[in-house]
Amino acid sequence: MDRRRFLTLLGSAGLTATVATAGTAKAASTGTFPGYKDSYGVLHDTTRCIGCRKCEQACNEVNKLPAPKAKFDDLTVLEKTRRTDADSWTVVNRYNAAGLDHPVFRKQQCNHCLEPACASACFVKAFTKNPDGSVTYDGSLCVGCRYCMVACPFNVPAFQYAEAFDPLIQKCTMCHPRLAEGKLPGCVEICPKEALTFGRRKDLVRIAHDRIRQNPGRYIDHVYGEQEMGGTAWMYLSGVPFSATGMNEELGTKSAPEYTAGALGAVPMVVGIWPILLTGAYAITKRKEKIAAEEQAEAVKQAVAASRAEADDKLKAALAKADKDKEAAVTREVKKAVDEARKTFEEELAAKEQPEAPEGDDAGKPGEDA
């Protein structure tokens, strides 16, 4: 994220005041958005859920999340109430509701609000409400303030506390990439009991009310998420009070941006402090990037030096071998010349040492007649 874009975002958020006068902090957005007309959603019928955790498995595989400590067929994890985290974007919990002789199971994940509190609270606009109904997150814009975690009424966004260098927010995306390919969300596709129904939100609202009307006594006469917090893409049916399955029934119907704008705006603050704090956050981020770049450059430098040293060693070894080979060749030639000279000398000496043949002249020998 470059400095120009960062400061531009600060300007659009109304946080670049340079006069340090007493004022009131404002949320990044105070407007309302009724949602996309033909957006999609999911209806979760908790009366059908059997707590098999197949949805958790599908979510893990589709999003390539880390392997869990307990296998997905290990149902002992249901003995404790869990919440989503950076490595688990959806979880199923078991509840023992009063008056029932069997447990109730409910899947938990991002509800993909029509007017997301996370998007409203995020001053760098790292969250996006998409036309397909999903709410997605762009980690390249995030500065790690975690306002989204505070703003979310459903406690969904999770921070990667275990990541030391580049922690990000993690949450369900409603399988946004799969929707773009015309596929169902992974959890919906794998559910063996059709406890999850995917479709256009307006159709799901109708389906939910039809089930309530056609099955008297089976459901609470309410579709959770139809109106809560201005409405959510993920909605619920239940046979017991929603509070019995850990859901907040006191949220009201006012949209989340109105709540977050009021909450942030109620905090008295010196306006001039915001640029300092946020520029400081930017500086920390840039310093981290600079250190990483320096470490990378140093690693490359060391690698080049090591390669050069290795090449020098190889060259020295080759030259030494060449000198040794040359010396050996000279020694061989000298020895050869000496051997040839010795051989020639010995041949000449042998020739000189041979006796001369007697002369053939017989005149004047005694006893011969004149």
Swiss-Prot record:
One of its GO terms (cellular component) is plasma membrane. It is found in: Cell membrane. The keyword Repeat applies. The keyword 4Fe-4S applies. [4Fe-4S] cluster 1 binds at residues 49, 52, 55, 191. Residues 1-258 are cytoplasmic. [4Fe-4S] cluster 3 binds at residues 110, 113, 118, 152. [4Fe-4S] cluster 4 binds at residues 122, 142, 145, 148. Residues 345-370 are annotated as: Disordered. [4Fe-4S] cluster 2 binds at residues 59, 172, 175, 187. Keywords: 4Fe-4S, Cell membrane, Electron transport, Iron, Iron-sulfur, Membrane, Metal-binding, Repeat, Transmembrane, Transmembrane helix, Transport. Residues 285-370 are periplasmic. The chain crosses the membrane at residues 259-284. Residues 40-70, 101-132, 133-162 form the 4Fe-4S ferredoxin-type domain. NCBIfam families: sulf_resp_HmcB. HMWC (high-molecular-weight cytochrome c precursor), ORF2, ORF3, ORF4, ORF5, ORF6 in the HMC operon form a transmembrane protein complex that allows electron flow from the periplasmic hydrogenase to the cytoplasmic enzymes that catalyze reduction of sulfates. ORF2 is a transmembrane redox protein. This is Protein DVU_0535. It comes from Nitratidesulfovibrio vulgaris (strain ATCC 29579 / DSM 644 / CCUG 34227 / NCIMB 8303 / VKM B-1760 / Hildenborough) (Desulfovibrio vulgaris).
